[in-house]
Amino acid sequence: MKITEIREITIPISSPIRNAYIDFSKMTLSLVAVMTDVVRDGNPVVGYGFNSNGRYGQGKLMRERFIPRVLEANPDSLIDDSGKNLDPHKIWNAMFTNEKPGGHGERSVAIGTIDMAVWDAVAKIEGKPLFQLLADRYGDGKPNRKIFVYAAGGYYYPGQDHGKLKDEMRSYIDRGYTVVKK
């Protein structure tokens, strides 16, 4: 069992919206695919990850530092103790080799995007949704089905006036949200 390839692409976010800090039409997003030699339903298992909007894609960091470290590591060193799956913590440690400790933002985005794809692959190899895998590994096996969520909105669209913004916020409340982040 091993990671056979990690692909990354950085693309522009095609959105005309902005908030008080960020014009999303100028932002980029990184997408990552972690390919494995594990086959499920006749296809290789592939885990996917992406960085959130509001953060620039970090493809250069991934391609120059973090992806090579994972692919150059001994594949056996990235397997969990059962020998049946990848170990996200060992993969994270491989990515963090020769890095100064700390949570520098751009680096965190790069590592976090790959880490998301690794966890997706691990859950697929295990044959479980990620939320169940996490509940099994780090909880009592019973996922909490009640999760706090909020509506994110209030972005400035070209031509949007305060009336439309008010209508948008009201629509979130009408749909049952109790908290709106703008």
Q: Which residue stretches match the model-derived regions?
A:
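Short regulatory "switch" loops immediately downstream of catalytic or recognition motifs
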Residues: 13, 28-40, 46, 68-79, ...
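Broad gene-expression machinery/nucleic-acid interaction feature
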Residues: 29-31, 113, 146, 179
